[in-house]
Amino acid sequence: NVMRGYLDPTKPFGIDLLPQGWHDTGDVVDVDSDGFIRILGRVKRFAKVGGEMVSLNAVEAYAQTVWPDHTHAAVALPDSRKGERIILFTDHSGATAEELQAWCKANGASELAVPKKIVVIDEIPVLGSGKTDYVVMQRMAAERFAEAKAA
């Protein structure tokens, strides 16, 4: 069920109706010819690299294709030159940017989707729901690369 509108805290019992019946959930979707909606990802799960929007979900999907028996999580950090840079965390000890880059090139994926850094960790943090905990991942990336800049 989707709500009919937003509750307005300044008007008890008042509901501001949604324009044209749409509610902005922050999801990126595809609506097929039968009207079925397929969720593709989240708006916030993009990095702006060199002026181009790169799906972090796609980066993870590429890594999953190259290393299917492992878990991966992509996050973006600010970059003074390119706007943002992509960091891929993985539990695969043999993961290399070169291997992922070769796969992307062979399969027509944008070179911008190749992470600048691949960080191997023991385990990708997850929420109670089993989904990747991107808040923790973002914090880990910021801390790790802040330390690298300071060194």
Where do the PLM segments sit?
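Conserved ATP/PPi-binding loop(s) of AMP-dependent carboxylate-activating enzymes
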Residues: 1-16, 52-54
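AMP-binding/adenylate-forming catalytic core of the ANL superfamily
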Residues: 4-5, 21, 26-113, 132, ...
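A generic alpha-helix propensity feature with a strong bias for hydrophobic helices
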Residues: 12-15, 71, 118, 128
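Short, small/polar residue-rich loop motifs at catalytic or cofactor-binding pockets
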Residues: 18, 23-25, 118-120
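Hydrophobic pocket-lining residues within nucleotide cofactor-binding pockets
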Residues: 54, 124-126, 137
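AMP-binding/adenylate-forming catalytic domain of the ANL superfamily
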Residues: 109-132, 148
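Acidic/polar alpha-helix N-cap and adjacent early helical turns
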Residues: 139-151
